[in-house]
Amino acid sequence: SLKDYQATTFDTADAVGTTAKQIQNSTADWMRLGESMNQAAESAKDANVLLNVSEFEGIDEATESLVSMSQAYKDLDKMDIIDVLNNIGNNYSISTDGLATALKDSASALVTANNDLNEAVSLTTAGNAITQDPSKVGAGLRTISLRLVGTEEAKQELSDLGEETDGMITTVSKLRDTIMDATKAASSDGKGFDILDSNGNYKSTYEIMQGLADLYDNIVKKDKELGTNNLNLLLETIAGKNRSNIAASILQNRDMLRSVYEDAQNSEGSAEKELNSYLDSIDGKMAQLENRAQEFWFKVIDSETI
């Protein structure tokens, strides 16, 4: 019953450092998105954990980001997502909420382009290293992943999003040839970097950007030696003029790309550890106190109605 559910929210709120009222409101938000009461109660708990281990201002922002990410990464438990964001947010120059904000815009496009969460977080962290503007990084990654798909549909999607599509290549063979030609001089075998794997399938956006990042120093060196302009050609091909700074930030941070990808895979339990620190803090204790006051009045009113 609703009354029984309300009674359980006080313990849930205590466990994550918020109030039963916020858990109840949050549960209602998730139910409006089509979740059952049990699912929504669990999602509300997770959203409040994200809020308390990040720098989000309020539960609405945390929920909005978690909705986008959990819809994109349907095979992952919401806490698995929060673990990765918290772990990388604690160890690199991007905040947990910064990662979530960027992925709110880019997760769907990145999943379509075969990037798992660890790859998406790596691209986001490296893309933010120079710009330090997560919302622009999210929009930039969405653009990069769609431009690297190289289809008319991807071009239309970018156009619908208000992104520039000038010079966008919309056939896979031409996109492949352009990137190989621009990286021939810089590659050790003289063949250039291939955006397709040995089976002829697309590499993920992360695999492509990591491969190009590994060649970055050599591309710059060869451009100087030969008087070519392959770096600019590459940046405009994969990102367009308006988002090329995001692509440049990724290509200049090859070691970060790799280390974030490796660290992200070892994130289990990260959010719970951070949450425990929050619960021991003044803010955490105050939230629990407020929650217990609400529970007291809930029981008083409940006993008076019997």
Locate predicted features:
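Short, Φ-rich (hydrophobic/aromatic) sequence segments
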Residues: V49, I81, N87, R243, ...
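Extended alpha-helical or coil "stalk/linker/tether" regions that are enriched in polar/charged
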Residues: V121-S259, A293
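Heptad-repeat coiled-coil alpha-helical rod/stalk segments, highlighting residues on one face
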Residues: N48, I59, T63-L66, K78, ...
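Hydrophobic, low-dielectric interface segments
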Residues: T131-G138, A264-I306
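A short, structural motif
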Residues: S1-D83, N87-A100, L110-N118, I130-K136, ...
